Amino acid sequence: LVVTVSIDNSERISRLLEKKGITHSVLNAKFHEREAQIVAQAGREGAVTIATNMAGRGTDILLGGNPDVLAEDLLREQGIDPEEATAQQLADAKASADEICQKERQHVLDAGGLCVIGTERHESRRIDNQLRGRGGRQGDPGITQFFVSCEDDLMRIFQGNQIGAMLNRIGIDEDTPIQNRSVTKMLEAAQKRIEGFNFDSRKNVVQYDNVINRHRRIVYLMR
């Protein structure tokens, strides 16, 4: 599961995967009508899904796939409308789907579960934690990995210059991966600052509303 912060980024990654010949699904606001189906099959063996951070929220990704959704897909492959299928056809499709999902679930478990990749850190630590929670749900195995660049909006606005200068002093080129506690702390500090700004903005809105509310109450009393 590859998670991006915007639709543009998700489509950009989709184009890169297409050039590499990697089969994948894209889940963003443009394809909201297929959201449930895409999320349901995101846990299948070998499945690659690109999603924005808001897409598919509140939906569990079942390792091995969702047998109910797969059963409908199997019927469509046979040219049968799931809503018009007979009871026997539904039962046969469900049995086949259960067998496929159970087998794939074991393969996915053996491979380490769902791998969640964040293409950048978000302004809110809460959203990052939600992404971490996508992998390893309900006792299943899973991993989460974030990739961060000094050119990301979060880094560029607040801490990018400092981190870039630090890396230049160390003598590390831009293609070398960095896993360092100092970088993580700087990221968290930037997120805290943004959260503080957002809190102050909401606080100011409430204060403005308190002033307007006095006028509103007087007008309502006059009416």
Regions picked out by a protein language model, each given a short descriptive name:
Residues 189-223:
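C-terminal accessory/connector segments of nucleic-acid motor ATPases
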Residues 1-13:
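Conserved strand-helix element at the start of the C-terminal RecA-like helicase core
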Residues 18-200:
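Conserved phosphate-handling catalytic cores of large alpha/beta enzymes
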Residues 6-9, 183-187, 207-212:
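A glycine-rich phosphate-binding loop feature that marks nucleotide/adenosyl-phosphate handling sites
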